[in-house]
From Swiss-Prot:
Superkingdom assignment: Bacteria
Gene assigned in the entry: clpP
Any GO BP: protein quality control for misfolded or incompletely synthesized proteins
Enzyme nomenclature, EC number: 3.4.21.92
Organism field: Pelotomaculum thermopropionicum (strain DSM 13744 / JCM 10971 / SI)
InterPro entries referenced in this protein's UniProt entry, alphabetically: ClpP, ClpP/crotonase-like_dom_sf, ClpP/TepA, ClpP_His_AS, ClpP_Ser_AS
Protein name: ATP-dependent Clp protease proteolytic subunit
Gene3D superfamilies, sorted: 2-enoyl-CoA Hydratase, Chain A, domain 1
Amino acid sequence: MNLVPIVVEQTNRGERAYDIYSRLLKDRIIFLGGPIDDNTANLIIAQMLFLEAEDPEKDIQFYINSPGGVVTAGMAIYDTMQYVRSPVATICIGQAASMASLLLAAGAKGKRYSLPYARILIHQPLGGVQGQATDIEIHAKEILRMRQFLNEILSRHTGQPIEKIARDTERDYFMSAQEAKEYGIIDEVYDVRK
């Protein structure tokens, strides 16, 4: 069962009840708390587009606690982050693994953060396919192409050479928040909100 807390707010018109995510959205906060799939991506994209329409100059705060997920769904979020005029600040809480680490790195320069005990994981894309040999070959070429462009994106956002990214993503590469800062995935480790 998935419980969502309700927040009650006093206004000049009386009480108003919001689910917690709607209340956070009023403060331009988007929360990714779980695997990235098409449904999650669509919700996050819709929230980003809404907040940009409300005020394209104001920051969007994107909190991430995710094990990663479907690359195409993650890329839809990534493209939207780059597309909207509002700067997207990223904040890692808990973990940003796989596709989620790329989203963390894709935040606006100078506005990519992590809490001190979060962990960050980068690696190459995973995939599995079965079927005819020709179809397997097609999918193998696609996952190799995907690995290349994901490495290029990570290189662009971290400032690391593509060769280092390719080496480091060959296997699971875990980082602490401080290590992620040194790597260029984030800009700052926060203990307390400023």
